[in-house]
Amino acid sequence: MSLFENDLYQWRETYFVLFAQSARPQAAAVAAALKRQDAHYEVTEVVADDAGQLESLTLRSPEDSSAMDITFVTGEEVTEQREELLNTLAKSTLGEGDREKLNFLGECDSRFDIYHFEEASFVGGGEDADDPLDPGALLLVMDCLAKLCRGVGVDPQSGSLM
């Protein structure tokens, strides 16, 4: 069950990891790497394709009161996003490391969508009653995925490369 269908969680933001499909990791390797990243992570609902490559998974981080749905995407949607990112980022001032990542984006034809959720542990509170969500687990997960697939993390809200 997707976290979107779970009343215990509220979606907050979506980040991406773009990569070349040839570097798509095995589902078992992703689950193991995430568990090594933090022993408190609960990795469930791991789905693989026929070749054993990751399709999707759910990760819960009870210590951060957060969770993530991670899904694999490829095709025209990724190509369009890649072109938009290339056009936008090419006009901005980038450091040397970001320039290398930008050049690599041109080779990317796949991505992982990381949907970040916050535990809805408040009763009757509105969005403004919440404390700001700590993105620590999200950033660690994004970094782990980027290393596994030799990809580039993207924060679409700020347009920055991670």
Residue ranges and their predicted role:
Residues 1-45:
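Short, extreme N-terminal segment that most often corresponds to the first beta-strand
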Residues 11-15, 54, 109:
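Short, surface-exposed beta-edge/turn micro-motifs
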Residues 17, 60, 113-115:
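Residues in well-ordered beta-strands of folded domains
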Residues 108-162:
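Glycine-rich, aromatic-bearing surface loops/beta-hairpins
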